[in-house]
UniProtKB/Swiss-Prot annotation:
A motif (Nuclear localization signal) lies at residues 53-74. Dual specificity protein phosphatase; active with phosphotyrosine, phosphoserine and phosphothreonine residues. The highest relative activity is toward ERK1. CDD domains: DSP_DUSP5 (cd14639), DSP_MapKP (cd01446). Residues 178-319 form the Tyrosine-protein phosphatase domain. It holds the Pfam family DSPc. Residues 19-141 form the Rhodanese domain. This is Dual specificity protein phosphatase 5. It comes from Homo sapiens. The keyword Acetylation does not apply.
Amino acid sequence: MKVTSLDGRQLRKMLRKEAAARCVVLDCRPYLAFAASNVRGSLNVNLNSVVLRRARGGAVSARYVLPDEAARARLLQEGGGGVAAVVVLDQGSRHWQKLREESAARVVLTSLLACLPAGPRVYFLKGGYETFYSEYPECCVDVKPISQEKIESERALISQCGKPVVNVSYRPAYDQGGPVEILPFLYLGSAYHASKCEFLANLHITALLNVSRRTSEACATHLHYKWIPVEDSHTADISSHFQEAIDFIDCVREKGGKVLVHCEAGISRSPTICMAYLMKTKQFRLKEAFDYIKQRRSMVSPNFGFMGQLLQYESEILPSTPNPQPPSCQGEAAGSSLIGHLQTLSPDMQGAYCTFPASVLAPVPTHSTVSELSRSPVATATSC
């Protein structure tokens, strides 16, 4: 089986009501772009940067490529479960042959060919989402912010009718649902989840750990609250806060409480803290911690820098298991202090580690004394 290119007109024909059930559309754009606007009925393939680097254009497990369990089970049935076509798209590429090796679309196409050898045909959309949206916007879900004009028109209706107009406000996917349980006392979610007192009450949350740029104490007046200001940037130092975050979570646990860890979207910073907690307290390897959390909140995707810091953290806190260095890593690591770290990594993570930029993998300074911790830019209650 091979990849076949198709244009927007052909995809539109596939998406006709009577044919839509036999077509699966996989959107390989970043999650936030997908959440804002997408082909109606499509699924987002949210491949983590570590998975992409490790794959190097090769195949990965079907659970990464087909995150929706129902769609995955259907496609993996004999004969593709009645699906005739799987269409892969990115932002705007015109030729699948020219896709970069580390691109999500390239990895998805390769993986589909490997896991669906006798199943539905695999297509690549020429021109990507940009072109398709410009030609057939009626086939897309376009989420736009509420404009000032719309607000004014609603106010006018209120004044004319004497009663408010029901406004169904849109919430992006990362704010939908509620916080997810990582452990019986540890929950993960977004800033929106943390602001909804009914969510917190229903889950018996007693503490909030906010890992974002802005402090928000909407529901914090009756909860234990800790704020760790961290930018979602590959240059941000989040590892220096691992231990204080772990101590706060443990303090809540020891008192029989429950803590919600959140950032803005619950995609990068707060999952990083939860992974560090699992690695420290449950002795999970990074891959195990990532998969464990991904199964519970599918859109998690820590940035390059945070994954690099987690890899370094793994080598510091978990028993080292010396392994021979892969030849491909020797050149990059030559003369570098990273050799010691590389030898302690589990074999399936060594390839991913070697592909990180040196600037990301440079040792991150950590606080080692109580006096140093007191100088960190953390706003927190005096106790947990």
